[in-house]
């Protein structure tokens, strides 16, 4: 038994399922999860001391790589002044100014401690500002675990939502409408059915929780236009894509302007940080200037702000996103080339520092229903083969992969050589 396996057995005695977030349990791929001891650059190290080239990146935040010296130095310096004050600090002001300078649609921003808090608060604000109750989301998109967002489509994608988790009353879930991602007709159908009741659309501009699904041309702008037509707010959830797809997020990359934006992951530099911001007239509706209540004991924590600012400053380096995109393209297209070489059907998507691969004969994946038809057994086999080769991918066929600036030529080469060997063995076994 490895030390990771022993720790997992020990953890299950005191922690539900042995983990503090379900995907970490490896239920999507089978086997026992790795317990991580440390990380540096492009590598993580498990409790047994084995090194892995990491394409999870703490689920997105580690865009510069693990344990970056500038972020580490900023955190250590901040710790000298205290861990938490529960009062305003200059660091919060600096972070707000940095975010606003990088994302043109954000005129004011409020810090929170997680992506879930950000989306939950943005939706409450949208409901309060519009005085409407219903929200519109998309099947396969994840926006955190707030009750109103853990809703899937019922008997069809255009029906009223049903709870997708026990503990969510149906009377509450009925205010969440679910449309088909990358399908404007499904959105218009709902707006025509509820023309004065929908407060907002919330959308992952690149869906990263059904693997990696970019928007088709015109989709995001179509949502913007419909929100304007029916008086709803457009919330772009950039918790995953913010400062990862481009310096101004996916909204800048695709040229669409939301009313509100939610952020997380990258802005924390590895610390627990979220944020929501947007039009000043909407943000002024939040307490203490407005009637919509939102608060948080650790919001704007000085250690987290210091880590985030150090990372955000580093992301302003010229040419960084072009270099990151080139690394991502090489990995995604390298996986596809190896799969083609060995006669294993695969489709790929990638944008900025995100990528996805799908074991399927479908040429292009643009919707959730296509993702669910992919070959999960092939994914599991590939996953464990890559893990044995020292490459750590997301342990779920429904999660995006992430590159960092720490992934160099050697890491990319080793990863693609490993993929070639694993896919060759899969072809032999089949």
UniProtKB/Swiss-Prot annotation:
Gene3D superfamilies: Aspartate Aminotransferase, domain 1, Type I PLP-dependent aspartate aminotransferase-like (Major domain). PROSITE patterns: AA_TRANSFER_CLASS_3. Its EC number is 5.4.3.8. CDD domains: OAT_like (cd00610). It catalyses: (S)-4-amino-5-oxopentanoate = 5-aminolevulinate. One of its GO terms (molecular function) is glutamate-1-semialdehyde 2,1-aminomutase activity. Pathway: Porphyrin-containing compound metabolism; protoporphyrin-IX biosynthesis; 5-aminolevulinate from L-glutamyl-tRNA(Glu): step 2/2. The modification N6-(pyridoxal phosphate)lysine is found at residue 265. The keyword Lipoprotein does not apply. Keywords: Cytoplasm, Isomerase, Porphyrin biosynthesis, Pyridoxal phosphate. Its cofactor is pyridoxal 5'-phosphate. One of its GO terms (biological process) is protoporphyrinogen IX biosynthetic process. It is found in: Cytoplasm. One of its GO terms (cellular component) is cytoplasm. It is an enzyme of class 5 (isomerase). It holds the Pfam family Aminotran_3. Belongs to the class-III pyridoxal-phosphate-dependent aminotransferase family. HemL subfamily. NCBIfam families: hemL (TIGR00713), PRK00062.1 (NF000818). HAMAP family: HemL_aminotrans_3 (MF_00375). Homodimer. This is Glutamate-1-semialdehyde 2,1-aminomutase. The gene is hemL.
